[in-house]
Curated annotation (Swiss-Prot):
One of its GO terms (cellular component) is cytoplasm. This is Urease accessory protein UreF. Its main location: cytoplasm. UreD, UreF and UreG form a complex that acts as a GTP-hydrolysis-dependent molecular chaperone, activating the urease apoprotein by helping to assemble the nickel containing metallocenter of UreC. The UreE protein probably delivers the nickel. Pfam families: UreF. It is found in: Cytoplasm. HAMAP family: UreF. Gene3D superfamilies: Urease accessory protein UreF (1.10.4190.10). The keyword Cytoplasm applies. Required for maturation of urease via the functional incorporation of the urease nickel metallocenter. Keywords: Chaperone, Cytoplasm, Nickel insertion.
Length: 223
């Protein structure tokens, strides 16, 4: 597929990042469940703030950087392997590690419905954003559009988790998605120009919640 095939690229992004794509993203909250239990996120405003913080300064930003680097390195087996190693090393908790690796494995398996040589270049246990970036590049899907779709899917997943945890209603969730559009566009543009030197986060509360979720008693989510 050529980079000019806009409709084909859109259709593939919609398929790959749809909640119906069989990767199991619905079962992860990224520590939000613990933050809700601790009272740190208790309403729609708090959920919206949580989302924006992760986009600008947390795991969603770092994942976008990894995706962009994998997209640019999609034909370089060594670079993809090194990027995957770094992505796994920077997972902030055991659950976060399992989340990104299991989602990556599931994505690669499901993406085999669109055969391409890039699937053979990806290492085992490729983190989710690395897998998406490489596969999107292999199919000629533009980087910035891939980043925007990936970030939107990440926000949607968090919002869905917040709704299931009872801190926001469906109307609130839609409002958060609408309010996040400008931030998603901004972060996608920044990430498209990023290098691995731009990795970094400042979300101690979210990272700590992800760690503490491992010992949470009653829970709905795997992270």
């Amino acid at each position: 597929m050529s980079a000019e095939s806009g409709v084909a690229a859109l259709l593939r992004l919609m398929a790959w990042l749809s909640p119906a794509f069989p990767v199991g993203g619905f079962s992860y909250s990224g520590g939000l469940e613990k933050a809700v239990e601790d009272g740190r996120v208790c309403d729609a405003a708090g959920l919206g703030g949580w989302v924006e913080t992760l986009l600008r300064h947390g795991s969603l930003w770092n994942d976008a950087v990894f995706l962009a680097h994998a997209w640019r390195s999609s034909q370089d087996t060594t670079a993809l392997s090194e990027t995957a190693n770094l992505g796994r090393a920077l997972a902030g908790s055991a659950e976060r590690y399992r989340e990104t690796v299991l989602l990556g494995d599931a994505f690669i398996a499901a993406a085999s419905a669109w055969p391409h040589a890039v699937l053979e270049l990806l290492p085992k246990e490729a983190p989710y954003p690395v897998a998406i970036g490489a596969v999107a590049a292999g199919h000629g899907v533009p980087l910035r559009e891939t980043l925007a779709a990936f970030l939107h899917a990440g926000v949607s997943q968090i919002v869905s988790a917040g709704i299931r945890l009872g801190v926001a209603g469906q109307k609130d969730g839609v409002a958060i998605l609408a309010a996040s559009e400008a931030v998603i566009e901004e972060i996608a543009a920044r990430a498209a120009l990023s290098t691995l030197d731009d990795l970094g986060s400042a979300t101690v509360i979210a990272d700590t919640a992800a760690m503490r979720h491992e010992t949470q008693g009653t829970r709905l989510f795997r992270s």
